[in-house]
């Protein structure tokens, strides 16, 4: 006997609010922070999110009878209070894995953060976390190389890597840009980088920049005996142009390229990561535009989700903020998504903002990149917070040295090695930071000048997006 079709409109909670449901290991789980309009029950708001991000529409439709809605629908299985926020609540939603294309971060985000964010019944909506099931993770390529392969390629072990962004980031000719790269690398840095908005502008076309940078890297390697690299930004107007730039970097023998993964898009990023894996090139990822999406504490997507998605899409290094510098991010939250980048298993821990256990299986890890308003006085805290599997990037903290970029690079290298040596000797480097740096400065005039130059520079602003604990 055929099922009866009842036309009309019914409440979302009649279908999508399922508090007795026990999530499956193969389900993709999501936690949303919801703020509904006044008078709309929480269960209805949560169910509406589950419906619109999976199989639902505003009206009952006859074509539901042509499929198994009970199998395919998203299910809101739990609602929790948000500590300290009477307006909002957490909605936990389970999605069957068959709703998503294998290996496609793009498809997952299109479903979970698509039309639902424009619902009139919602004042605010924020995607706080996703639990990706192993069955989905195994279909994703992930980082093209990973932490260990990058260390082997660059022959650098036992410490954080050291880098800087070339400044001024816009306006230099290709030749002068290459000169600054050389000064930084010969001074002691492992990497230099293009900033996010250097592509191919009238003052500096990309081919010209790539050629002068390659010459600078080669010369610095010959002089120092160390492997060096520069993140050549391949982000472009079209995928074809992006791959053309990547191929040219490979022809020049460069070890690493760069992509702006949010402005460039996950489709482009996944494709470039696959190219890097095939061609043996490292991939640095910049998160330009992330704060538009993740900074509001009640609306958007938390950066931990964007970090997880990047690990799945592919990248060997990702910017994560600094905790101590000029960019947003408190310590526990930052450590939470650094764990998601580097660890093979991350347990649920609300004190770090992780709402679910996340098993990454054998997927390689991603270097966490600390960049933005940092200088030598921050070095002990950065080493303590980020650990060895990180890249510490000092832009103004290198080029702003009174003696020039090479001296700034030398100061940072001496400070880093002093902190690593003190840590390995069992000293509490954050508590003893001043003594450690001043001791090292006795043998490094570059560091002594840097410490004097930046002794009064602090970024003491309260964090906007705090953990709900």
From Swiss-Prot:
It comes from Paulinella chromatophora. The basic functional RuBisCO is composed of a large chain homodimer in a 'head-to-tail' conformation. In form I RuBisCO this homodimer is arranged in a barrel-like tetramer with the small subunits forming a tetrameric 'cap' on each end of the 'barrel'. The gene is rbcL. RuBisCO catalyzes two reactions: the carboxylation of D-ribulose 1,5-bisphosphate, the primary event in carbon dioxide fixation, as well as the oxidative fragmentation of the pentose substrate. Both reactions occur simultaneously and in competition at the same active site. Its EC number is 4.1.1.39. It catalyses: 2 (2R)-3-phosphoglycerate + 2 H(+) = D-ribulose 1,5-bisphosphate + CO2 + H2O; D-ribulose 1,5-bisphosphate + O2 = 2-phosphoglycolate + (2R)-3-phosphoglycerate + 2 H(+). SUPFAM superfamilies: RuBisCo, C-terminal domain (SSF51649), RuBisCO, large subunit, small (N-terminal) domain (SSF54966). It is an enzyme of class 4 (lyase). Mg(2+) binds at residues 193, 195-196. It is found in: Plastid, Organellar chromatophore. This is Ribulose bisphosphate carboxylase large chain. It holds the Pfam family RuBisCO_large. Keywords: Calvin cycle, Carbon dioxide fixation, Lyase, Magnesium, Metal-binding, Monooxygenase, Organellar chromatophore, Oxidoreductase, Plastid. It comes from the Eukaryota. GO terms for cellular component: organellar chromatophore; plastid. The modification N6-carboxylysine is found at residue 193. Its cofactor is Mg(2+). GO terms for biological process: reductive pentose-phosphate cycle. Binds 1 Mg(2+) ion per subunit. One of its GO terms (molecular function) is monooxygenase activity. The record marks 326 as: Transition state stabilizer. Belongs to the RuBisCO large chain family. Type I subfamily. Heterohexadecamer of 8 large chains and 8 small chains. The active site is at residues 167, 286. Substrate binds at residues 115, 165, 169, 287, 319, 371.
């Amino acid at each position: 006997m055929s099922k009866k079709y009842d036309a009309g409109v019914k409440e979302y909670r009649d279908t999508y609010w399922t508090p007795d449901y026990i999530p499956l290991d193969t389900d993709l789980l999501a936690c949303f922070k919801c703020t509904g309009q006044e008078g709309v029950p929480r269960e209805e708001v949560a169910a509406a999110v589950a419906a619109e991000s999976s199989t639902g529409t505003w009206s009952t439709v006859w074509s539901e009878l042509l499929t198994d809605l009970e199998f395919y629908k998203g299910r809101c299985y739990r609602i929790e209070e948000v500590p300290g926020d009477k307006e909002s609540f957490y909605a936990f939603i389970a999605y069957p894995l068959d709703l998503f294309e294998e290996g496609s971060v793009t498809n997952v985000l299109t479903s979970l953060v698509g039309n639902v964010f424009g619902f009139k019944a919602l004042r605010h909506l924020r995607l706080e976390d996703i639990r990706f099931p192993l069955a989905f993770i195994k279909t994703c390529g992930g980082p093209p190389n990973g932490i260990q392969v990058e260390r082997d390629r660059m022959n650098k072990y036992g410490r954080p890597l050291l880098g800087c962004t070339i400044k001024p980031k816009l306006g230099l000719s290709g030749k002068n840009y290459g000169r600054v790269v050389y000064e930084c690398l010969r001074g002691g840095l492992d990497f230099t980088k293009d900033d996010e908005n250097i592509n191919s502008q009238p003052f500096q076309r990309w081919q010209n920049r790539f050629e002068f940078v390659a010459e600078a890297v080669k010369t610095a390697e010959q002089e120092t005996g160390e492997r060096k690299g520069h993140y050549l930004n391949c982000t472009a107007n079209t995928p074809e142009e992006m791959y053309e730039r990547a191929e040219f970097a490979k022809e020049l023998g460069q070890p690493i390229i760069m992509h702006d993964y949010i402005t460039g898009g996950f489709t482009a990023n996944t494709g470039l990561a696959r190219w890097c894996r095939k061609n043996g090139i490292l991939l640095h990822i910049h998160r330009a535009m992330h704060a538009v999406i993740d900074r509001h504490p009640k609306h958007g997507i938390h950066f931990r989700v964007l970090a997880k998605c990047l690990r799945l899409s592919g990248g060997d290094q990702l910017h994560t903020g600094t905790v101590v510098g000029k960019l947003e991010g408190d310590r526990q939250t930052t450590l939470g998504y650094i764990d998601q980048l580097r660890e093979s298993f991350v347990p649920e821990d609300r004190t770090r903002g992780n709402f679910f256990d996340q098993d990454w299986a054998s997927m390689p890890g991603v270097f966490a990149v600390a960049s933005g308003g940092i200088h030598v006085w921050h070095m002990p805290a950065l080493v303590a917070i980020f650990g060895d599997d990180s890249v510490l990037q000092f832009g103004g903290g290198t080029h702003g040295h009174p003696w020039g970029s090479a001296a700034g690079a030398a100061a940072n290298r001496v400070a880093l090695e002093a902190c690593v040596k003190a840590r390995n000797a069992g000293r509490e480097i954050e508590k003893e930071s001043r003594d450690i740096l001043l001791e090292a400065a006795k043998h490094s005039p570059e560091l002594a000048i840097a410490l004097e130059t930046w002794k009064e520079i602090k970024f003491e602003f309260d964090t906007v997006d705090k953990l709900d604990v």
